[in-house]
């Protein structure tokens, strides 16, 4: 019988990412999960020989990823982490995930990471991480083909776009090879400085054009606090913009992540329904998998 991890109502921090991160409305571009991700297939994104992107193969590499997560989420963003071990960001899902890391070949330092929960692992655990924040009942029909992304972060000194680009190319290559056409994740909008005004305004701005059909909508377990006023939202954070350009849908209202003082927007990307220019790139990755 599968061991079920009962979803706690403790939220995480900001993606797809994160998927996972937090800051004020005037400093969104400094957020690690919102490093520019314009086109993971573009020709000029040639391999950066200083950086190596790979799936972690041993515990030391996974520990390095957890230390990076702690430095970004706790030290930089002030999140309240409850992993139980000082200096590490970890939870009960980590043991069941594949961990993608980017290392600097000149130093050996891990400078970027993402984690991926595959459908088979989610079945063993009994839930996805997103189940701790949302009621995912309406996604049950696609769960056998749905992988979940999260805990993404990049070292502050490497936020040029190369790290996140390399990770996304590998994530897409892997998911194509493994037959995971649906990618579930969250993009996070900070609430620390404005109490949620930006998050509410983004929801009102984006829901009319980017909300998934009712059959795929999910519901937050902890909704955002109500507001007496809002404002015209600026452009969405870069990571969210990238997802939307690739055809991702917002699955419902954001959840309130108390630990990270942030709003998590649930998003779903269907690799079989990408815009034409992305489909061409995906076909290139598919040939690489043959």
Give residue spans per PLM region.
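Conserved N-terminal entry element of GNAT/NAT acetyltransferase domains
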Residues: 2-59
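Short amphipathic alpha-helix that is part of the acyltransferase structural core
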Residues: 41-111, 115-120
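Beta-rich nucleic-acid/ligand-interaction surfaces
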Residues: 84-93, 191-192, 257-264
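Short low-complexity, flexible loop/linker segments enriched in glycine and/or proline
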Residues: 90-91, 197-201, 265-269
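Short, conserved charged micro-motifs
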Residues: 109, 275-279
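Acyl-donor binding region in acyl/amide transferases
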Residues: 119-248, 254-255, 261-262
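C-terminal "cap" of GNAT-fold acetyltransferases
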Residues: 260-274
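Short, cationic low-complexity segments
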Residues: 285-290
């Amino acid at each position: 019988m599968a061991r079920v991890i009962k979803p706690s109502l403790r939220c995480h921090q900001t993606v797809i990412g994160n998927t996972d991160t937090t800051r004020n409305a005037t400093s969104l571009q400094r957020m690690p999960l919102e490093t520019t991700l314009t086109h993971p297939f573009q020709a000029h994104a040639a391999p950066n020989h200083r950086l190596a992107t790979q799936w972690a193969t041993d515990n030391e590499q996974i520990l390095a990823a957890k230390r990076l997560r702690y430095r970004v989420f706790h030290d930089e963003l002030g999140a309240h982490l409850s992993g139980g071990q000082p200096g590490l960001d970890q939870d009960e899902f980590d043991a069941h995930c594949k961990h993608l890391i980017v290392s600097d070949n000149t130093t050996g330092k891990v400078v970027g990471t993402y984690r991926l929960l595959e459908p088979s692992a989610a079945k063993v655990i009994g839930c996805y991480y997103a189940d701790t924040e949302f009621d995912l009942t309406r996604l049950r029909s696609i769960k056998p083909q749905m992988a979940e992304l999260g805990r993404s972060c990049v070292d502050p000194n490497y936020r040029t776009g190369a790290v996140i680009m390399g990770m996304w190319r590998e994530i897409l290559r892997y998911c194509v090879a493994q037959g995971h056409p649906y990618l579930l994740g969250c993009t996070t909008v900070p609430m620390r400085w404005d109490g949620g005004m930006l998050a509410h305004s983004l929801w009102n701005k984006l829901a009319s054009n980017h909300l998934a059909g009712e059959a795929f909508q999910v519901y937050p377990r902890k909704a955002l606090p109500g507001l007496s006023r809002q404002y015209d939202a600026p452009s969405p954070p870069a990571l969210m913009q990238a997802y939307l350009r690739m055809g991702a849908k917002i699955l419902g209202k954001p959840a309130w992540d108390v630990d990270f003082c942030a709003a998590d927007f649930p998003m779903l990307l269907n690799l079989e329904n990408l815009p034409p220019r992305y489909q061409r790139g995906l076909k290139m990755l598919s040939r690489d998998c043959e």
